[in-house]
Amino acid sequence: MSAFACSAVAAPARGAIKANSSSVCAIENGKAVAVGTSKQVGAFKPVFAAAKAAKATTFSISCSAASDEVPDMGKRKLMNLLLLGAIAGPTIGAGGPFVSFLVPPKSGGGAGAGQAAKDAAGNDIKVEKWLETXKPGDRSLAQGLKGDATYLIVKEDGTLEKYGLNAVCTHLGCVVPWNQSEGKFMCPCHGSQYDRTGKVVRGPAPLSLALAHVNVLEDGVVAFEPWTETDFRTNTAPWWK
């Protein structure tokens, strides 16, 4: 069985906020259970509590495999919970808008009217505040179209990229973390990889990550809008239409 060590870091941070998955081996009825038992463990509670205390609005996630094996289905579900649960943490108790993040979307795309990007507390993201903590090269998750976890990208000049990337892997729907050291999005479930623009560079994922337009409204709110034109990475029609 593959082991993963995952950490969630909140900003503004009061020290690192971490959760180690080594004590968890499976998901039982949607909840983490301890190795060899059916007793539920509170592996995520310290992350949620610390994030709430820090009044964090952005999170970065890092994961590293303890072996090169492909994680089993329990690990896959656990990874999704860790990646998105860290974002949902401040609002789980109140049943806030990020609770839906705990269930991977059935579709990787997004269609319909543009909508405000939401932060970890479920509030509209204001570009000025976001850029105070998200530095050049940053790729952090926000709630996007259809509630999908979507990366906002900060360019090297410190401004927001004009597109966002749907974080759902096009293989089997895992949430794909950004690997800063490798400069790629690397899926922990079956090894698919995507470059900085979300273009697939290694299977088994068959397609690139879905795109969404990113606009800044007059009041400074960041908004996502559906991407319906040609995919600039492949020069083809968008598969997520």
From Swiss-Prot:
**Gene3D superfamilies per UniProt:** Rieske [2Fe-2S] iron-sulphur domain, Single helix bin
Provide the transmembrane region boundaries. Answer: 83-103
Q: Report the EC number(s), separated by commas if there are several.
A: 7.1.1.6
Note on how the cofactor is bound: Binds 1 [2Fe-2S] cluster per subunit.
Q: What's any one GO cellular component for it?
A: cyanelle thylakoid membrane
Record's superkingdom? Eukaryota
Give disulfide pairs as residue numbers. Answer: 174-189
Keyword annotations: 2Fe-2S, Cyanelle, Disulfide bond, Electron transport, Iron, Iron-sulfur, Membrane, Metal-binding, Plastid, Thylakoid, Transit peptide, Translocase, Transmembrane, Transmembrane helix, Transport
Its Gene Ontology molecular function terms?
A: 2 iron, 2 sulfur cluster binding; electron transporter, transferring electrons within cytochrome b6/f complex of photosystem II activity; metal ion binding; plastoquinol--plastocyanin reductase activity
**Cofactor(s) required, per the database record:** [2Fe-2S] cluster
**What SUPFAM superfamilies would the database entry show?**
ISP domain
UniProt catalytic activity: 2 oxidized [plastocyanin] + a plastoquinol + 2 H(+)(in) = 2 reduced [plastocyanin] + a plastoquinone + 4 H(+)(out)
Could you tell me which residue ranges the Rieske domain spans? 127-223
Q: What does this gene product do?
A: Component of the cytochrome b6-f complex, which mediates electron transfer between photosystem II (PSII) and photosystem I (PSI), cyclic electron flow around PSI, and state transitions.
Self-association or partners: how does it assemble? The 4 large subunits of the cytochrome b6-f complex are cytochrome b6, subunit IV (17 kDa polypeptide, petD), cytochrome f and the Rieske protein, while the 4 small subunits are petG, petL, petM and petN. The complex functions as a dimer.
The UniProt entry, under PANTHER family, shows: CYTOCHROME B-C1 COMPLEX SUBUNIT RIESKE, MITOCHONDRIAL
The record's family statement is:
Belongs to the Rieske iron-sulfur protein family.
Q: Cross-referenced HAMAP family, in alphabetical order?
A: Cytb6_f_Rieske (MF_01335)
- More details: This protein is 1 of 2 subunits of the cytochrome b6-f complex that are encoded in the nucleus. The Rieske iron-sulfur protein is a high potential 2Fe-2S protein.
- What this protein is called in its record is Cytochrome b6-f complex iron-sulfur subunit 2, cyanelle
